[in-house]
Amino acid sequence: MTDPALIDELKTLVEPGKVLTDADSLNAYGKDWTKHFAPAPSAIVFPKSIEQVQAIVRWANAHKVALVPSGGRTGLSAAAVAANGEVVVSFDYMNQILEFNEMDRTAVCQPGVVTAQLQQFAEDKGLYYPVDFASAGSSQIGGNIGTNAGGIKVIRYGMTRNWVAGMKVVTGKGDLLELNKDLIKNATGYDLRQLFIGAEGTLGFVVEATMRLERQPTNLTALVLGTPDFDSIMPVLHAFQDKLDLTAFEFFSDKALAKVLGRGDVPAPFETDCPFYALLEFEATTEERAEQALATFEHCVEQGWVLDGVMSQSEQQLQNLWKLREYISETISHWTPYKNDISVTVGKVPAFLKEIDAIVGEHYPDFEIVWFGHIGDGNLHLNILKPDAMDKDEFFGKCATVNKWVFETVQKYNGSISAEHGVGMTKRDYLEYSRSPAEIEYMKAVKAVFDPNGIMNPGKIFAA
């Protein structure tokens, strides 16, 4: 869509200066963190109200113009990429927390509220927003809802879906729907709210969301444990889960740790070299809980599941231990990683990881593989690092070949090709490995109801 007359008409729907067509803006707002697709939007529009969003959607319907939602653009599946002349709808100016309800522990947010902004707001109120991940400083609530974002606390607090009390959406027809009205109990038929969570903007745009908040955790304490092999991580998880209510249980490989330590600004947890590491967190609200954690650690050492470990003794040490895990994605970005975000049920994780690791190692022995993830909920992040001497297109082509084998294994284990990053365009052609043909047809039928003209983020989840 490059018709200047249509762009001029679009400009009348928003405030002056809130439609951009310069090359820098098109490049910046037409992409997310994926590097697989060249951005090529026609324009970027910045609404400041629900009414303006409705007007934009109705304009797009009238002229059959495709729209792509844009939040913090931190996604890893190209769900926010505009590569085919679409108009990008950025929610940067709809960024306010509109209301706080102390009794209900809820905050009413516009879609452009940054995740860390909501976290800080909750903290200022003596509360806690628990959905957390490395991109919290720039990701936006609308995007979190669009991908049903997970992160590092899912084992205790669940996904974004669990924290949406209600929301307002503008459908692909331009209708405004208020979903669930912030109720805890609402047994009145279909919960349409759940359809829009994880829909990646393909049904409509979230324009307001009421987010639930939680009590603040107290005296959070972390342990980093080194294990002799991956199989040992699972009994460690079970041992600690039997004794403590964990708030997190993460894992990473020795190669992941080496990359982070290579930065020079993060201390090693201990001197012993181990092939795999687990990071777990719990609330040490009493001295007995801390003692129980130490006793469980000693038990794991006696069983041969743990070679070495350390437990945080201060807030600073807690932060340093978390940096070992949280800095991985940022650190390996230098190597243009090809990322897979896959999941199986927790009990299948060891056999699944071994099989995937063997597949990649057999076919591409020269590729460096970095594993990490949220082992407590069965979510593994497989990262294949690009050799410095290899062209990016050649590298991505080889990785795409690996994908088929990886996803066939995911299907074999009844897993998901996308645990928390969404489908977007990067996983679109592999959806059949996680969803049956009947499911996909019903999903397309749902989209047709809310977006009959196919203007809402077309080409994401399934082909346009």
Curated annotation (Swiss-Prot):
It holds the Pfam family FAD-oxidase_C. Its cofactor is FAD. Activated by Zn(2+) ions at low concentrations (10 uM) and inhibited by Zn(2+), Fe(2+) and Ni(2+) at high concentrations (10 mM). (R)-malate binds at residues 325, 329, 339, 421. Induction: Expression is up-regulated by exogenously added D-2-hydroxyglutarate or D-malate. Binds 1 FAD per subunit. Zn(2+) binds at residues 374, 381, 420. GO terms for molecular function: FAD binding; metal ion binding; oxidoreductase activity. It is an enzyme of class 1 (oxidoreductase). One of its GO terms (biological process) is respiratory electron transport chain. Disruption phenotype: The deletion mutant is barely able to use D-2-HG for growth and displays a relatively slower growth in a medium containing glucose. Cells lacking this gene also show high accumulation of extracellular and intracellular D-2-HG. Moreover, the mutant strain loses the ability to utilize D-malate for growth. Residues 37-216 form the FAD-binding PCMH-type domain. Its EC number is 1.1.99.39, 1.1.99.-. Homodimer. This is D-2-hydroxyglutarate dehydrogenase. It comes from Stutzerimonas stutzeri (strain A1501). The gene is d2hgdh.
